Regions:
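Hydrophobic residues in well-ordered beta-strands that form the structural core
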Residues: 1, 58-60, 212-214
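Conserved core segment of the aminotransferase class I/II
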Residues: 81-82, 86-158, 166, 249
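Conserved glycine-rich beta-strand-loop-beta hairpin in the small C-terminal domain of fold type I
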Residues: 140, 155-165, 177-190, 222
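Active-site phosphate-binding strand-loop segment of PLP-dependent enzymes
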Residues: 4-73
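PLP-dependent enzyme catalytic core of the Aspartate aminotransferase-like
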Residues: 84, 194-196, 203-212, 218-256
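A generic structural signal for well-ordered alpha-helical segments
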Residues: 51, 81, 168, 204-205
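Short amphipathic alpha-helical/adjacent loop interface patches that line ligand
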Residues: 60, 154, 161, 241
Length: 256
């Protein structure tokens, strides 16, 4: 139950409570994918109060937690309340931060012993056992020795986002970029262009030869949006932006 307003998203808590009345599990994502919203402490406490009131278990997806790009702090919801710590699963991974999904490393924090043992039993039944040979040494090295690199990476991505915003403001000002607090993703509103998703896909994917994620991939609430990944070398980013601009000119039968 997210509401889009003035290039930002907020939660409709009245609707959320209605959903909680008929739910056993709530999936929280922070920073949120695809919008990049980091839910602040005040919002998380409201979610906690609803979860306690309706006895809802929380699965918190925090895999983008390292990509907090503003002054807003990221909180693990389990750190804010003892009841939630015992009724939640926190999902973390270095895969996003260090671009190593191939190592299949993830960390799950399940403080409730009974739930943790049930979860491990189900994982074993599915044939998911020990991490591969490289995973443990990799995760130890990444978390112990790579802090400076992560700081540099966050600043680089922050500047990449700024470049994209400035570029679109100059060349395609009808694109509205959602204000985000984290992740290396941009959630872009193209409704002012008065084109449908098929036309958008033809423009960016075919004419421009740039791959973006279409809003419909995220459900009906994604209509009129697309998601763009900016975690790339700046030279490649500028090439992609110029391709998008040139494709837009072709779409509108204008000179490149």
């Amino acid at each position: 139950p997210l509401v889009y307003e003035n290039r930002k998203y907020h939660i409709d808590f009245h609707l959320l409570e209605e959903c909680f009345k008929h739910s056993k599990v709530f999936v929280l994502i922070s920073p949120h994918n695809p919008t990049g919203t980091i839910w602040n402490k005040e919002v998380l406490i409201k979610i906690i109060n609803l979860a306690k009131k309706h006895n809802v278990f929380i699965i918190s997806d925090d895999v983008h937690a390292d990509f907090t790009l503003t002054n807003d702090s990221h909180y693990l919801i389990s750190s804010l309340d003892e009841w939630v710590a015992n009724h939640s699963m926190i999902c973390l991974s270095p895969a996003k931060t260090f671009n190593i999904p191939g190592l299949e490393i993830a960390n799950l924090i399940i403080e409730n012993k009974e739930i943790r043992e049930k979860f491990i039993k189900e994982m074993m039944a599915l044939g998911i056992h020990n991490p591969n040979y490289f995973s443990i040494p990799a995760i130890i090295s990444l978390y112990k020795y790579c802090t400076d690199w992560v700081i540099y990476l966050k600043e680089y991505i922050k500047n990449n986002k700024k470049i994209v915003k400035e570029f679109f403001n100059e060349y395609i000002p009808l694109l509205d970029i959602t204000e985000s607090d984290g992740t290396y993703l941009l959630w872009i509103n193209y409704k002012k262009l008065s084109i449908n998703e098929n036309e958008l896909a033809y423009w960016i994917n075919n004419l421009s030869r740039v791959k973006v994620s279409l809003g419909s991939e995220f459900g009906k609430e994604g209509d009129g949006f697309f998601r763009m990944n900016v975690a790339m070398p700046r030279e490649k980013l500028l090439e992609a932006l110029n391709r998008i601009k040139n494709g837009f000119c072709l779409l509108n039968n204008r000179e490149i």
